Amino acid sequence: MILLISDLHLEEERPDITRAFLDLLHHRARGAQALYILGDFFEAWIGDDGMTPFQRSICAALRELSDSGTPIFIMHGNRDFLIGKAFCKAAGATLLKDPSVVQLHGEPVLLMHGDSLCTRDVGYMKLRRILRNPIVLFILRHLPLRTRHKLARKLRSESRAQTRMKANDIVDVTPEEVPRVMQQFGVRTLVHGHTHRPAIHKLQIGDQAAKRIVLGDWDKQGWALQVDEQGFQLAAFDFVNPQLALPGA
């Protein structure tokens, strides 16, 4: 059994989400073949050298799971793209490139955070290209921590304001981009997060059936995708009783 999650937006101000995530680590993930975290794991990440005590506690919890034998893979999101090798090494996790094709129970599956699929959001795509430029990343990582904190707060504030003003179809994936990317990587299954619109979409690519699975964000409830011999099963769970509502739970 393999678990995939995304968009937890972990922060100290949401202990309910943190408790639910730790419950996931201590129960379902403990016996999993792998745990994939597909971006926006943290609400903000200003660099591995700027870890708070809260973030260090999450790192330690991941390390405990990794040491128990469950491989952990972390992908950058638009909120935590400064997560680096130091954090992953401390957490016992592997940093996964976006996009990546992985084998899940014998099937090649394309994993993405999902923001790069939202090509109609021209302003965001332009900002994304700037922030992901290697030179810009180098500069960001070497700015004083205080400056990075201010910049992160400014970017989050502007992002929320702009998202509220944009039409729903603008901030969702571009329909034509999905089959193009899937054909490019030669897969029939795509899993991503980012849009906060959990669903399993059936597609037709050429003469082949395909599917796009959108992971949910953790806010009023949590979401996880379980992949096993039975296939792909997307399910939500309640924070009040954070045992996953997944088959076999």
UniProtKB/Swiss-Prot annotation:
Superkingdom of origin organism: Bacteria
A biological process from GO: lipid A biosynthetic process
Record membrane topology: Peripheral membrane protein
A GO MF label: manganese ion binding
Metabolic or biological pathway, per its Swiss-Prot or TrEMBL entry: Glycolipid biosynthesis; lipid IV(A) biosynthesis; lipid IV(A) from (3R)-3-hydroxytetradecanoyl-[acyl-carrier-protein] and UDP-N-acetyl-alpha-D-glucosamine: step 4/6
Chain sites annotated for binding substrate: 78-79, 121, 159, 163, 166, 194
Cofactors demanded by this protein: Mn(2+)
PANTHER family: UDP-2,3-DIACYLGLUCOSAMINE HYDROLASE, UDP-2,3-DIACYLGLUCOSAMINE HYDROLASE-RELATED
Protein name from the UniProt record: UDP-2,3-diacylglucosamine hydrolase
Organism: Pseudomonas fluorescens (strain SBW25)
